Amino acid sequence: MVGCDLLWLAAASCVLTLVSPSTIHQGYGRPRNSSNLDLDCGSPDSPSSGICFDPCQNHTVLNDPTRSTENNDSSVAWCDDNLHGWYRFVGDGGVKMPETCVSVFRCHTSAPMWLSGSHPILGDGIVSHTACANWNENCCFWRSEVQVKACSEELGEYHVYKLQGTPECSLRYCTDPSTAPKNCEITCRPEEECVFQNNNWSCVCRQDLHVSDSQSLQPLLDCGDNEIKVKLDKCLLGGMGFKEEIIAYLNDRNCNGTMQDEPNNWVSMTSPVVANYCGNILEKNGTHAIYRNTLSLATDFIIRDFRVNVNFQCAYPLDMSVSLETALQPIVSSLTVDVDGAGEFNVKMALFQDQSYTNPYEGAEVLLPVESILYVGVLLNRGDTSRFKLLLTNCYATPSEDRHDPVKYFIIKNRCPNQRDSTINVRENGVSSESRFSVQMFMFAGNYDLVFLHCEVYLCDSTTEQCQPSCSTNRLRSSRPAIDYNRVLDLGPITKRSAQSSATSKGTPHTTGFLLAWPMFFLPVFLALLF
């Protein structure tokens, strides 16, 4: 129980006690006939009626962050029915009582109490106010008289409160966390302020922020493989007049939505990495593919007078994957491979124009002179590429689109290149998520217009298997491989262009013609069947 007993009639020292955490400040009284409104004097009928004291020097300190209005822990409802006397609130929960109604079940109690009125300033002396308790949808369901005085010290001003318990339980006097001292342990941006809420310091958007220059709204970009995430500063948007719900549109107005909240006071919207989708503009140079778009912001879905337009772009280094994604009509084959215990993987095979593997052939077919080098790239573009490596076990050409065609010219056989064909160059196989090789056209095209490529793929578990091939002479002479045709990718047709093209057969040639019409082709095929 808090109280103030008369210790001496002449010169009394009033000592206040309270369960920790608290600090006791002591002061000396003055005769009751003092006319100074800064002093608190005992009741006329009490033993201390002749004693007056300054509550700025004689009060109990309450350092309890659970009194913060941000505290919504209602597991235990505490009550202040035992608080009688002068008190000063300190600490991270706030140093002043709130001056507006507080929601129920805040401040670690059921019915939180707040100050109905403005705090006095220095020179006002002791001011009487009503403390209200919110309950039953009534911000002032219970009332209690509170006296308040503004005080000063070297570090600034503060307030003390004379409390008289509470009308009922569980009622508790709250503190406003926005008045807490700025002993912030984190660094906030200039458009933020540091506040103590939910028992932690955090950065929140400044309420007094006013922004007129939209150029200050610089986006943060997350250039992902499948989408671009555009993040904007939520505080700056608030300073421009935007509310919690911000509607964003891309160049294609059908691509719109509410910007999503991100950590640290940012909001975001995503744009797919697809050419011409949602108004994306794709540009390519020799090294990068660049996607451009504009994010237009509005306050709702009806108003079309966009207040802010934010241009953004993401540049992707050209590689096999990006070049295929940005090509309009690449010649590509796709296969889904299921691996027990590891899920589904997607594998793609495409034809490229040069050894950079960034310029895929586009259109319905490829037309090449017989002396051309054909560049073939295969990539694993979905799945755990850190664990599984892409391995080409068998790659071969056929005179028809039938992958089962018995006439096969092997480029890669049993994981190793055909060493009898000096034009074959396997640049990568079994070491990453990509495999690539090249071969000269005339070595397998024969004297016919159309040929087809087929590659059997295997996803090698690098944690349990040796994935990079070891190609010895004995291995090269091994028997004809058993091909799993369910894991074969097909490409074609590849059309051969030559001076005698008018005399060659058109369409898909039959097997006999593929072998015999061009004598130069017979020997490589015969040797390929043997090795």
Swiss-Prot record:
Alphabetized SMART domains for the sequence: ZP
MF (Gene Ontology): antigen binding
Region (Beta hairpin): 34-53
Pfam families named among the record's database cross-references: D8C_UMOD, Zona_pellucida, ZP-N
Glycosylation-annotated residues: 33, 58, 72, 200, 256, 285
Region of interest (ZP-C), ranges: 340-478
Changes seen on gene knockout: Knockout mice lacking Gp2 fail to induce antigen-specific helper-T-cells and antibody immune responses after oral immunization with FimH positive bacteria. This is not due to a general defect in the immunological functions, since a normal response is induced by other systemic immunizations.
Region (D10C): 54-74
Keyword Nucleotide-binding: no
Oligomer and partners: Interacts with SYCN. Interacts with bacterial adhesin fimH.
Name used for this protein in its record: Pancreatic secretory granule membrane major glycoprotein GP2
Organism: Mus musculus (Mouse)
Originating gene: Gp2
